[in-house]
Amino acid sequence: MASENMTPQDYIGHHLNNLQLDLRTFSLVDPQNPPATFWTINIDSMFFSVGLGLLFLVLFRSVAKKATSGVPGKFQTAIELVIGFVNGSVKDMYHGKSKLIAPLALTIFVWVFLMNLMDLLPIDLLPYIAEHVLGLPALRVVPSADVNVTLSMALGVFILILFYSIKMKGIGGFTKELTLQPFNHWAFIPVNLILEGVSLLSKPVSLGLRLFGNMYAGELIFILIAGLLPWWSQWILNVPWAIFHILIITLQAFIFMVLTIVYLSMASEEH
């Protein structure tokens, strides 16, 4: 176990605590005595998500500036493969005309993948540095295991769904879609509104919770292995799970991207 002074329950609970800032006092929250208030922010999730987003921009910009028509390097080849894969997915699933969808899909796929990839770091590495070097009370390094992050991303997708729906169908067409489907009669407007409203709202909710649930479960398994087993036996389970987890983090990034494209394609369809 990583800490001899903690029980397994304390160890697991410690690694599930976020580094929070109380916006009323601008002071760090004590994980052992959190305030019962809405006005807190998970600054570790904010730091790592923004940092990884900037890393994505810097890497792709540097490759774009150094791109040549000759024989590309290994890193440039890998980037081109990712771009080609995402662009092909967009062409297959999005049938409207928009210059935003392909860059958006690429950003979502790479950004979510990088956030998920943080789950493969040794579970005690950064939290130990944060606690013993920086004096921080807690630290979680996987932004996509924070429901606030995943639902915020899903909210952004939801706003785009509304934007494309109104842009392609107009206010009247969008309103008619909500009130006159699936039953095309004025008497069923309340029923249609409930059904279509639930269907519309379920898209961002399921999108965000799916990513959160899978990444939270993956993070929890790593914590359980480290917290319940002696150090010399952790590798027996850690290595196979880490190898399998590479598939999970890639698949979850792909699913988030695909569902975003599909939802925006549905919103762009004219009826």
Curated annotation (Swiss-Prot):
Entry's family note: Belongs to the ATPase A chain family.
Assembly with partners or alone: F-type ATPases have 2 components, CF(1) - the catalytic core - and CF(0) - the membrane proton channel. CF(1) has five subunits: alpha(3), beta(3), gamma(1), delta(1), epsilon(1). CF(0) has three main subunits: a(1), b(2) and c(9-12). The alpha and beta chains form an alternating ring which encloses part of the gamma chain. CF(1) is attached to CF(0) by a central stalk formed by the gamma and epsilon chains, while a peripheral stalk is formed by the delta and b chains.
Pfam families noted in UniProt: ATP-synt_A (PF00119)
Protein name: ATP synthase subunit a
Keywords of the record: ATP synthesis, Cell inner membrane, Cell membrane, CF(0), Hydrogen ion transport, Ion transport, Membrane, Transmembrane, Transmembrane helix, Transport
TM spans (from-to): 40-60, 100-120, 146-166, 220-240, 242-262
GO terms of molecular function: proton-transporting ATP synthase activity, rotational mechanism
Function description: Key component of the proton channel; it plays a direct role in the translocation of protons across the membrane.
InterPro entries cross-referenced by the UniProt entry: ATP_syn_F0_a_bact/chloroplast, ATP_synth_F0_asu, ATP_synth_F0_asu_AS, F0_ATP_A_sf
Entry-linked SUPFAM superfamilies: F1F0 ATP synthase subunit A
Main location group: membrane
Gene: atpB
GO cellular component: plasma membrane; proton-transporting ATP synthase complex
One GO biological process term: proton motive force-driven plasma membrane ATP synthesis
Subcellular location: Cell inner membrane
Membrane-topology descriptor: Multi-pass membrane protein
